[in-house]
Amino acid sequence: MSANTQYIQQEVLKVLDQLSMPEKLSQQAMDESWQKLNQLQVLDQIDITSLDFKGTRSPLDESITIYNRGDMTADISGWHIQAGSPDQQYIFPEHTYLSPYEYIKIDTSGQSEHSFSSNQPVWNNRGDLGTLVNHHGQTVSSFVYGDKAHPHAIISHVNYDGKEFRSEGDEYVEIHNTSEYTVDLSQWRLEALRNDHCFVFPENTQLAPLTSLRVFTNKASLEDNEYSFNSPTALWNNDGGGCKLIDYQDREVSSYHY
């Protein structure tokens, strides 16, 4: 569980404890309790969903997108997006509201409603960290990619002794996010060391804070955070082997030997 989630759960329990007291609360106390719960809901349900750092038409054609996955309109006036450099910051103006299930895209340059208005790229193509911070200075969401993600993405386990006969399609490699950031794995790949099998993570593959994903040898019905090589034959030799995780710039991130 991430520190942010743990904080939110603890604060929600405090409010619920107050509301469950036998003594009748004043209207002011009730209003304050609801306000606190609303603030916690917003803190939990606003996310950075994507960061386009490559620039398709030009190096300035970058953007970062946030999303309200809750059913309450969020006032994000005074919140800011912090890029990797301290002077790269976008502050949301007064009267900025994020409706339920709405996206807001913040461009690097140009005259769109939300833009850094920068004449140079904001997001480093080799790797960077984007952070959404509320008006109290609390981190709401963080998104990391490239070399900035290297310390946080590890191959944590290889289940090389499958139970399925012959194909051993239930064997898998597990990748874990050790950080409080959302890690972008788009176009990263997982390579087997003893054969030429390779799995490439599709665009928009993300690993939430302190969670894991599994890449199976051959699994048809996939759940959240599950992927498959779709190999009809076994990949992982019971006598020994290994694999490595490579990022989108062909740099090794993690390896695992058994």
Feature-to-residue mapping (PLM):
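Intrinsically disordered, low-complexity Pro/Gly/Ser/Thr-rich segments with frequent PxxP/GP/PP motifs
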Residues: 87-118, 196-229
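Beta-strand signatures of extracellular beta-sandwich domains
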Residues: 80-82, 131, 189-191, 244
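Short amphipathic alpha-helical heptad-repeat segments
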Residues: 5-12
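Charged, low-complexity interaction regions
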Residues: 20-27
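A structural motif detector for short, solvent-exposed N-terminal "entry" segments of globular domains
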Residues: 34-79, 120-126, 135-189, 233-239, ...
